[in-house]
Amino acid sequence: MKRISRNKLLLGVVIALILSSCAKKLDLFPVNDLTPEKTFSTAAGYKSVLAKIYGTLSITGNAGPAGAPDIAGGLDEGSQVAFIRMFFNCQELPTDEAVCAWNDQTIKDFHGLKWTSSDPFLKGIYARPIYNITLINEYLRESTDEKLAARGISGADATDIKKSRGEARFLRAYNYWVMLDLFGKSTFIDESNQVGTDLPGEKSKTELFAFIESELKAIEAELGTVKTAEYGRVDQGAAWSLLARLYLNAKTYIGTEKNTEAITYAKKVIAGGYTLHSNY
């Protein structure tokens, strides 16, 4: 009897601990109080997030010069998280056009064409576009007509935010082009994937090419005409330029030449009135 009573007592204690540890679990809130409801409550909030999306191509995080990187995981913030630097390294160091004389980890493997999947520089340039795309997807989820109306955003503010959706989609297409150009395929997520619920899929070269091409053509009318956008923001010329580059390398991407299309969009860019600096 004593043994049975002792077992019952022990069972009761365990149940009590379990119940107490689960208490109010549904009442927990994010540690970061900048929830979408707060961040996107005003037109200024939308523009701040859009600026962050553009900024992912040049900055490494939200604090300067370093200390709060967007991407963790033991990667060096200066050399392995910065998009421009990593993209340059991957594109140029394997060629005879550039030399890196530093001994930073595996950087010289790019010269020797002997990098591996565990290379920290490659991990960084894989993670960066996917991180950027994740931000863009959230922006697209939160900038629908329904969300703007629910938040009382209307008039010129709503018009600018709707226009910015085309810019965000361009930047997403650009990031996917980076993945296509460097890796040949990519993890794929868009605004229909709910954060924390859907596992990301994967797209092949052909699928990525088709997605990028269709996105750039779909947003052409939504982007500002050439040289009319606010400084630093993309316009139709950016979409034409990326389409020209996509078509120029189509033989590598999908096995089919699209030189005629490349010429068509290159001519659009040239006709847009862009010029080289007089002294460069």
PLM ranges: what are they?
Residues 22-82, 280:
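Membrane-proximal, proline-rich intrinsically disordered regions
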Residues 1-31:
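Bacterial Sec-dependent N-terminal signal peptides
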Residues 37, 63-90, 189, 224-239, ...:
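Short, surface-exposed recognition loops and adjoining beta-strand edges that mediate ligand/DNA contacts
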Residues 27-29, 180-191, 259-260:
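Short, well-structured active-site flanking segments
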